[in-house]
Amino acid sequence: MTKVLFVKANNRPAEQAVSVKLYEAFLASYKEAHPNDTVVELDLYKEELPYVGVDMINGTFKAGKGFDLTEEEAKAVAVADKYLNQFLEADKVVFGFPLWNLTIPAVLHTYIDYLNRAGKTFKYTPEGPVGLIGDKKIALLNARGGVYSEGPAAGAEMAVKYVATMMGFFGATNMETIVIEGHNQFPDKAEEIITAGLEEAAKVANKF
């Protein structure tokens, strides 16, 4: 049975957040089209994820080398392992997130930090790092009020670019990206822009 992990990185209500509307539209369409799949929803804001710090960094390094961990290190590594293993076990992963202050919410950055583990999501080789999750399907669902796909702000976009870069670093080769943008920049076209994006999400979810 196919396992699908939906990762939500916005705790604003749908009526206030287009990225949440996008996430919910994709989720509903996916469930309808794939009734036999196992769908797990991970709301990062409900998880209260601790930032990566000295215990997690030292603990993951020592664990990878087979060294003994302190009690604090073991606790920190157990937190990261919980989310890392869940990610690795999923056949498909869907990320729903906004662009905030040109980048992603801190909680999503922390989550991706947990996934960034040598020997698990990538490995070191003499030629450089090699990703290890190549057969995992990834979908990135993002909303941003301005236009960042082109024009003067394109170089400043660090949300989709960051998540896509990290998934690529982990070896993902099968990625879908859906972006709704410009609804705040062009308020007279907002309804049209959002509706078109939600329709695209439903179509992509059916085939994802």
Curated annotation (Swiss-Prot):
Q: Which Gene Ontology molecular function entries are recorded, alphabetically?
A: electron transfer activity; FMN binding; oxidoreductase activity, acting on NAD(P)H as acceptor; oxidoreductase activity, acting on NAD(P)H, quinone or similar compound as acceptor
Q: Name the family.
A: Belongs to the azoreductase type 1 family.
Catalytic reaction(s) noted: 2 a quinone + NADH + H(+) = 2 a 1,4-benzosemiquinone + NAD(+); N,N-dimethyl-1,4-phenylenediamine + anthranilate + 2 NAD(+) = 2-(4-dimethylaminophenyl)diazenylbenzoate + 2 NADH + 2 H(+)
Tell me the cofactor note: Binds 1 FMN per subunit.
Quaternary structure and partners: Homodimer.
* Residue stretches in coiled coil: none
Q: Which Gene3D superfamilies match?
A: 3.40.50.360
Look up the record and name the cofactor or cofactors this protein needs. FMN
Task: Supply the alphabetized keyword list.
Answer: Flavoprotein, FMN, NAD, Oxidoreductase
- Which residue ranges run through the membrane? none
The protein's name is FMN-dependent NADH:quinone oxidoreductase 4
Q: Does the keyword Oxidoreductase apply?
A: yes
| InterPro entries (UniProt xref) | Flavodoxin_fold, Flavoprotein-like_sf, FMN-dep_NADH:Q_OxRdtase_AzoR1, NADH:quinone_OxRdtase_FMN_depd
Q: What does this protein do?
A: Quinone reductase that provides resistance to thiol-specific stress caused by electrophilic quinones. Also exhibits azoreductase activity. Catalyzes the reductive cleavage of the azo bond in aromatic azo compounds to the corresponding amines.
HAMAP family for this protein: Azoreductase_type1
Q: Which NCBIfam families match?
A: PRK13556.1 (NF010075)
What top-level branch of life does the organism fall under? Bacteria
Which residues, if any, are the signal sequence?
Answer: none
Q: What's the short name of a Pfam family annotated to this entry? A: Flavodoxin_2
Q: What is its EC number?
A: 1.6.5.-, 1.7.1.17
Q: Which PANTHER family match?
A: FMN-DEPENDENT NADH-AZOREDUCTASE 1, FMN-DEPENDENT NADH:QUINONE OXIDOREDUCTASE
